[in-house]
Amino acid sequence: ACPISNYRYLEKGYESYFVPLEANKYLFKKIDLQKKYDVSFFGAKKSTREEYIKYLNENKINVNLMGFYNVPDYNWDNLSKFISQSKIVLNFSNTGNKNKFYSHSTIKHNFFTFKGRPIMVGLCGTLCISEFSPANQILFNNYLPTFKNKEELLSECKKILNDENYYNKLKNSFVEKCNEYEDHIYFKKI
């Protein structure tokens, strides 16, 4: 489920649709709770994630974690609640250096892939800040704040957290954009 693949099929003349797997508004739903976490992340501890989170913590941006150091309690309600209580949820696109089975072992591959996390977060009524990936640029354009290194991430977090009006404007436009990818919207097209 990658928007880049969708475009490649369309270029070849095939009928194609981008169908995100993580876009069900009945699973990922906004729960009206107080935003008690400034910045959060849910997911596994891999690639550069720990380095970025540590850098934020060292610079007085506390990152609340779910499933990072232990097996996550992932059921849809707990995850929606966790996201809904956060002002910002981080998304990391970097898969890390990996050797693929078809490549020579001396060639390292570092992928910046599409993750469904931004859509999940937006459906819960929360803002996401994402590591850059080409797919996110296609889907969200300027509606999704992005970063390419830990310094940019810190700067973006500070800018958003220190300006409530800017935060609300950004969050509302991001959430509206995410709703365009919700299952019940694109099912009608198919």
Indicate residue ranges for each PLM-predicted region.
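A charged, aromatic-enriched C-terminal amphipathic alpha-helix characteristic of glycosyltransferases
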Residues: 161-190
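Conserved aromatic
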Residues: 115, 147-148
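Nucleotide-sugar donor-binding catalytic core of glycosyltransferases
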Residues: 1-142
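Catalytic phosphate/metal-binding cores of nucleic-acid and nucleotide-processing enzymes, i.e., regions
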Residues: 109, 153, 171
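Short, hydrophobic/aromatic alpha-helical segments in well-folded domains
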Residues: 78, 117, 156, 173-174
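Short, flexible helix/strand-to-coil boundary loops that buttress conserved ligand/catalytic motifs
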Residues: 140, 157, 171
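C-terminal "capping" alpha-helix adjacent to the active site of nucleotide-linked donor transferases
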Residues: 148-166
